[in-house]
Amino acid sequence: MLQAPSSSNSGLNQGNAAPDGPPNETQPYEGLDAAAQEEIKELARTLTSQSSLLSQEKRITGTGDPNTLTAASSSSLSRSIFASDIKGVNPILLDVNDPDYDETLDPRSENFSSVRWVRNMAQICENDSDFYKPFSLGCAWKDLSASGDSADITYQGTFGNMPIKYLKMSWRCISRRLFHRTHGKSEDNDSGFQILKPMDGCINPGELLVVLGRPGAGCTTLLKSISVNTHGFKISPDTIITYNGFSNKEIKNHYRGEVVYNAESDIHIPHLTVFQTLYTVARLKTPRNRIKGVDRDTFAKHMTEVAMATYGLSHTADTKVGNDFVRGVSGGERKRVSIAEVSICGSKFQCWDNATRGLDSATALEFIKALKTQATITKSAATVAIYQCSKDAYDLFDKVCVLYDGYQIFFGPSKQAKKYFQRMGYVCPERQTTADYLTSITSPSERIKDKDMVKHGIMIPQTAYEMNQYWIQSEEYKQLQVQVNKHLDTDSSQQREQIKNAHIAKQSKRARPSSPYTVSFFLQVKYILIRDIWRIKNDPSIQLFTVLSHAAMALILGSMFYEVMLSTTTTTFYYRGAAIFFAILFNAFSSLLEIFSLYETRPITEKHKTYSLYRPSADAFASTFSDVPTKLATAVTFNIPYYFLINLKRDAGAFFFYFLINIITVFAMSHLFRCIGSVSKTLPQAMVPASVLLLAFAMYTGFAIPRVQMLGWSKWISYINPLSYLFESLMINEFHGRNFPCAQYIPSGPNYVNATGDEVTCSALGSIPGNNYVSGDDFIQTNYGYRHKNKWRSVGIGLAYIIFFLFLYLFFCEYNEGAKQNGEMLVFPHSVVKKMKKKGIVSEKKKKNQPTLSTSDAEKDVEMNNNSSATDSRFLRDSDAAIMGNDKTVAKEHYSSPSSSASQSNSFSKSDDIELSKSQAIFHWKNLCYDIPIKNGKRRILDNVDGWVKPGTLTALIGASGAGKTTLLDCLAERTTMGLITGDVFVDGRPRDQSFPRSIGYCQQQDLHLKTATVRESLRFSAYLRQADDVSIEEKDKYVEEVIEVLEMKLYADAIVGVPGEGLNVEQRKRLTIGVELAAKPKLLVFLDEPTSGLDSQTAWSTCQLMKKLASRGQAILCTIHQPSALLMQEFDRLLFLQEGGQTVYFGELGKGCKTMINYFEAHGAHKCPPDANPAEWMLEIVGAAPGTHASQDYFAIWRDSEEYREMQKELDWMERELPKRTEGSSNEEQKEFATSTLYQIKLVSYRLFHQYWRTPFYLWSKFFSTIVSELFIGFTFFKANTSLQGLQNQMLAIFMFTVVFNPILQQYLPLFVQQRELYEARERPSRTFSWKAFIVSQILVEIPWNLLAGTIAFFVYYYPVGFYRNASYANQLHERGALFWLFACAFYVYISSMGVLVISCIEIAENAANLASLFFIMSLSFCGVLATPNILPRFWIFMYRVSPLTYLIDALLSVGLANASVVCSSNELLKIVPPSGMTCSEYMEPYMQSTGTGYLLDGSSETECHFCQFSSTNDYLATVSSSYSRRWMNYGIFSAYIVFDYCAAIFLYWLVRVPKKSKKLKK
């Protein structure tokens, strides 16, 4: 609707003039038959729907009376659209003070008319068509077929079978490729299954196509195929798709923005406001040939305001879009944001996948009307897949395509479809809408055969394959072939040139003509950068936390080295190196968590790429720039305080060089981590290489192991490590040109006071005998091999890495697509699949037309009969007349009787004896209000809502999107977590007790389930924990089986829930949601929030019949519903109708045919409800619920002043007064908050969680793979380290690096915990399934065994390669110390888990929790005594050394690994001393060696030169770092106590922060 439209109105109905089918034989006139009558009705409905645009126009302009409007002719629509009163004025420069001001063109006006605005834009284009270059785009496809990458059944990957599964898949892939290469065959369709069977179609400019079919029929795949969005499945090479002469490849590469697919899910940046979201899109789609005299930003702002006004979003402009976890606009409003986003794009060919899901009936109809207006005026084309299509909406479509299990069974004019299927042999019941009738054809239990045709033995197609064959041989198919071939054969060179010129005219100056994008790369980066700045401004928590944590770490780490670094002697050599090493590491790894944010925004980037808004590389470039301020802020807050606290060289040049190097470090590593994130498909895939690189770069920086000491096989790592060059520059920067006074001479003491010259030497490396100082250049040359000439070389290398990683990151972002999603399929546990194969239910190779496991039972029976029939029979006859009679009878009941359903009849008849919990209690509420705090006060969401739900009744809760329907359910069910509730809520006149939440069933709008559980397991879990404790397991299991039977879930009862696309489909998930609540046997009532949302009409009907069935068994049901058909509406007993603001406009009986409700509104001033109108759409229209409509009066005030309201108040007063007298209160046992004991809850929840871990192989294998690779890498880096001084230091640093796996493993765990917590807090806690104690304790218990296993693996791949066992063998303690090391390794991995639970228990966002854990870990590691020994710490920080848990771990690992062995110095570690003349080395050094108690001489008898080693035992070396083997068991006990403390603190913090406290939220 919001594009620059075409000026020409010729050919508006192009393609609509197809013949009406085969000519009928001449017959005697017998009056109007049923088909003719139906045709007249169809025409009347079409004309009525077309006149709705005119009536809307009249209401807006003030002409005509909406109460007396009648159907207009089709030409009225054209006159309305192309009326001459629109002259084409500039709507952007309107001035309210201008006498010619037209408020209907001003989106900020309440009287804005989107229809007039589009007409006005059309007139502007017509006035200067050479400038605006209008064009149109249609599409035709021939032999379109698509296949998925896997079969329709697969087994679930687990920790045990995942390696074998992947090996099999790899082998299959390799062998297939080799086979095809050898035999020269195509890979297409070799493995996997066909989603779409060959089909044809054609949609011309100005047309609307509706695609109908049940979930799983292939509607989504068809839309994706014709919108060039085929990632995840393959299109057959034989397929031909053309868009006015352009191939799908050309469209994808050059004109992608003109063909757009809008997915069913609403994915947006949650922290952007509605205005910011749409304004960004408008900027990126602002054409160069826009209205003259208007700049880009003004035009984009106007288009944004028009979109918001058109779709009723103006009031939400400054509200965050939000998502399931970030509070924002309502679900219906979020769907409208998605619609507005595509409308602003102005694409000429749009594909909408279930775009009306979540919208109320009136808004959904207005959306289709808007599409119709857009198509008619702008000559665009739209294809819409709708599961629930109302009569009025269907009448607006030009063509319809019906799909059945991937087969096309009709494509043609929407007015002919009904007659086609009636001719095929299926009857349309009188009360059924055409769309519902067409969809019902694809459901064996819903469709009704023509009794006369059956009696005469006429064969009626039944299976999808038979209907497809019937379609291929029909006259309608031949007509379609003519249209498609005409489209394909038409010379389209002129149209191609027209489209090409129009595309170039829209593009900004610097955009390439062949580019599919409207604006240049520079403008894309600019606009996305602004968007990212808005996002950060709206939610700066992560950035603020990062900056503040860096500042805190600078103060902590800097003060740790403060005292020792005040000295400038040689004692600071090690600490200066350690401090610089710490600075490099901290700056380098501060960007590791950016990987998290990449995966959060990737789906949005991929969506916008398909809209041709911007290149993914532009988004990547902008995101890099948007993070620059945060990076600079963190660099300043960390490096400046840190530099001066650790007393590095006080020289301006040295300081700025230090700052420059660390800035380079930050950006080089940031780009590297972004590269890893962009090249990986999933977060676990990214974290494993990131953790390995983190470890490798840290170890091969040059501090832990100087390059001269590195093993030959691994030295190359230091050469490709950017940090090694940057560390070298910082060391040169600090040590060059400085002489450090010697702090310790060897030998020293009273006996050596008079020693001179070569008789003493400084103990530091690089010393020269006789000198009282050590040159900094000599030190770094001797120890590290660094030379001053390389100082600036490293800067160049660092900058080269930044540029290289940046371009690599942009490349991967541009060309690496996201993870593929397989075709929709059921997933079963491996054991179930084995049983199914034994029984012959599935086989390794599927036959071409074999029924799938998603096929319904009824159709399965039909197809099985077909397989056993004669092969020469094209169509099946029903073998039993009784079956056909039953079909007709059932269908009559379906559409005539309000109490039965065809689709449910069989299952209900089998399950009539199911003992559903019956309730006698009446649930009622009075004057219920709900207020939430906002910036300037409070906002009322519910305004004095009254009502009741009685046993055995079905009450509908209806209202526009955002009217407060879900909020009302949440308030009544005690599920609100903020705000103030006032009013009274009673059960039989008594206040709700604490057992109330578990005594009700609440089916949420979102189908929240544990994705790794099976359907049966989910139901049993609910039954075990929510049914009474005194009910036996056998009874609960039996009841679950009955629920499975009632809900018709037997076919997939053992299937894994999974995620949409790989698991249960939308319908199956909705049934499971209802089943989980039924399995709990709610004794009071059942709440259902949008149970029919996302379902097709037949499933929605079945769901409604299920609710009716439950009500007939005594259940009280309150159900919100968005798009009820007229048929569905009549199934409800009562209606609670809310308007915007949570205000009641009606509560009472619906009456037969909704007459009672209709009479009420008509009696209070509403215009008459047309006889064939949907009462739901009519009543939403009269209260102004649809965008662009307004109520003619205040229906809330009318309701409060009505007689019906007064009668309701009397009834409520009677209930409050009399009901407590008639019933007794609940017993103490019944009032328990939970049905089962805490211990039983912990047992079951832990059991379920253990299964989830086992069935989440990526998490476990990532954990173990990270452990194996990291520890093995450390082990072989320090392979068989000796006991020289450098070898001892290497072993100490190996132990230090052993703990570096902390961050990667913890970061893998946090998202898994968050998923568990979201499910628990959203569904299981509110329903009182189990307590918070059971939740947190089970999280703790289940992690421990896996971490013990990880610790065991780490021990074996680390302990033996490093060679610690050799030190133990010297003291004959091999087994004891090996066992001790294993205990500490296991304890450390359990500690990682305990810290993870601790930080995430009270923090919402995993990224913030990871930052906090990293902060704790760095502090613990810094103060553990390795980098800074206790003797050099300031007195203030001594307590940190004592409270750091790693102090005790490192102390224990050092002593267990190194103690009780001899030191053997290497040649360059031996100090050379010349003894006085006449003395041997032993005589000269003996006093010194006795005073220090350590050291040894290589040759004591020498009189010329002594070679002295400073240590003789590893125990002496351990003493320098305050480590002792005697404290090993004390250290183990203290470290274990820290683990226990973490777990206890996690439990306490979870209770403190996240458990709702009992408060008096409900006030009178």
UniProtKB/Swiss-Prot annotation:
Compositionally biased intervals (Basic residues): 839-849
Listed Pfam families: ABC2_membrane (PF01061), ABC_tran (PF00005), ABC_trans_N (PF14510), PDR_CDR (PF06422)
A GO cellular component annotation in the UniProt record: fungal-type vacuole
Polar residues bias (residue ranges): 1-16
Binding positions (ATP): G959, A960, S961, G962, A963, G964, K965, T966
Domain ABC transporter: 174-430, 923-1166
Keywords assigned by UniProt, alphabetized: ATP-binding, Glycoprotein, Membrane, Nucleotide-binding, Repeat, Transmembrane, Transmembrane helix, Transport
Membrane topology: Multi-pass membrane protein
Name of the molecule in the record: ATP-dependent permease PDR10
Gene name linked to the record: PDR10
